[in-house]
Amino acid sequence: MHVKSVTSIKKKPLVDAHGATALYQIFWQEDESGKVFRAKKPETMKSFRHFARITLEPGETNNMHTHRDAEQVYFVLRGGGTVQVGDERRTVKAGDAIFLPVGVPHGFFNTGERRTVLLLVGAKT
């Protein structure tokens, strides 16, 4: 069994293609330098790629980006904003889940007045 508390995970600032967000890599198929492990880590599922928490302050975004080899789900834990998947934009709030298909540009924009917290789950395709 593998149990990790988000409070024990080192916050990783993202200031690259994902904008200035904070990422907590809870279960991740790569190490902190981005190196992908050849053998699956024991806490990961077969097609699993990552499980993380993303925080976005008001006005922040993780920028539009595409994953060529993974599909993802954002789950809004707190706050809300606008999510764009392809050409479609929708307003979302806490409790909403958004499926992000492989190869489709997507991004989350915190258009609210308080911090938004997302749960991110990804699987290789």
Where does each model-flagged region fall?
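Glycine- and acidic-residue-biased ligand/ion/polar-headgroup-sensing regions
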Residues: 69-71, 76-82
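Short acidic-glycine-tyrosine-enriched beta hairpin
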Residues: 87-102
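Conserved short histidine dyad/triad with adjacent acidic residue
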Residues: 31-40, 52-68, 102
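A short hydrophobic beta-strand segment most commonly corresponding to one strand
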Residues: 73, 99, 114-125
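Short beta-strand His + acidic residue motifs that chelate non-heme Fe in jelly-roll/DSBH
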Residues: 63-64, 83-84, 100, 106-112
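A short, N-terminal "cap"/entry segment at the start of jelly-roll beta-barrel domains
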Residues: 1-48
